[in-house]
Amino acid sequence: MRDRCMLSFTKEQLTSVGEYCTLHSSPLPKSVEEQCRVTDERSQDEVVMAPSPAQCAWLMSFALASRPRRILELGTFTGVSTLAFYEGTRKTKAEIITVDMSEEYLQIAETAFRRHGATDRIQTIRGPCLEILPTITGEFDLIYIDAAEEEYEAYTRFVLDHKLLSAEGVMLVDDGTYIRWFYFFQANWWSVLLEGLVVDRSIVKEFPEEIQEPYLGIADQMNDFNRYARSDPRVEVTMIPLFNGVTQITWK
């Protein structure tokens, strides 16, 4: 229907729908499937930081279709999305640089990269993304942002100001950083849409009382980023109600 931009499911239905989509998509490569399982063994409040198997399949297909030569990922976590990009660029042999400030998570990711023979094209860098970005040179055809949400605008401004995004490149801005209250919700919804809180502040009443005010602040931050991205005259911006909400940015 034209007036519906996304399907509506209850939180209880989301897991089943995700599993159905994965079942009816091409099988995930062994490396991605195995790292999804490794990630699922983490505590529930950590697991929600990782892309779902269905999202990994989409990231792979996006990389396969766009054929990037170089990929920059801000936010590695356990390396699930990194491996999805690796598998999606086997034909093009894309160079992948992934950045994360957590030594613990990078060790988990690097172990997986070695186990699956992916170190030939993946370079990991540890440190805060805003400190690492100035040290990165060259252009990237695909930039994937999945790190600290309060820094989304700063990441995007730096990428554009320093032309890290190639002329025909695509920047995908996905969900943000970990908040300990995630485990209250079955779906991974921390995103540029913030489960609708960016457009309907009354939704906050569904949250535990002690986090309502902080989450309204988070919604304000996400709205600030969304408005900034839309108003930057240098780029074309499309916000897609896909998974947790994905903003796609390209040069005009």
UniProtKB/Swiss-Prot annotation:
Keywords: Metal-binding, Methyltransferase, S-adenosyl-L-methionine, Transferase. InterPro entries: Cation-dep_OMT, SAM-dependent_MTases_sf, SAM_O-MeTrfase. Its EC number is 2.1.1.-. S-adenosyl-L-methionine binds at residues 73, 75-76, 81, 100. It is an enzyme of class 2 (transferase). The keyword S-adenosyl-L-methionine applies. GO terms for biological process: methylation. Hancockiamide D displays potent cytotoxic activity against murine myeloma NS-1 cells, suggesting a potential antitumour application. More interestingly, hancockiamide C, the likely end metabolite of the hkm pathway, shows potent Arabidopsis thaliana seed anti-germination activity, but is inactive against the monocot Eragrostis tef seed, suggesting that it could be a herbicidal lead targeting monocots. The herbicidal activity of hancockiamide C could be due to its phenylpropanoid-like structural features, which may act on the plant lignan pathways, and hence warrants further investigations. Pathway: Secondary metabolite biosynthesis. It comes from the Eukaryota. GO terms for molecular function: metal ion binding; O-methyltransferase activity; S-adenosylmethionine-dependent methyltransferase activity. PANTHER family: CAFFEOYL-COA O-METHYLTRANSFERASE 3-RELATED, O-METHYLTRANSFERASE-RELATED. Belongs to the class I-like SAM-binding methyltransferase superfamily. Cation-dependent O-methyltransferase family. O-methyltransferase; part of the gene cluster that mediates the biosynthesis of hancockiamides, an unusual new family of N-cinnamoylated piperazines. The NRPS hkm10 and the NmrA-like reductase hkm9 are proposed to convert two molecules of L-Phe to the intermediary piperazine called xenocockiamide A. Xenocockiamide A is then converted to hancockiamide D via a series of hydroxylations and O-methylations. This is O-methyltransferase hkm8. The lineage of its organism: Eukaryota, Fungi, Dikarya, Ascomycota, Pezizomycotina.
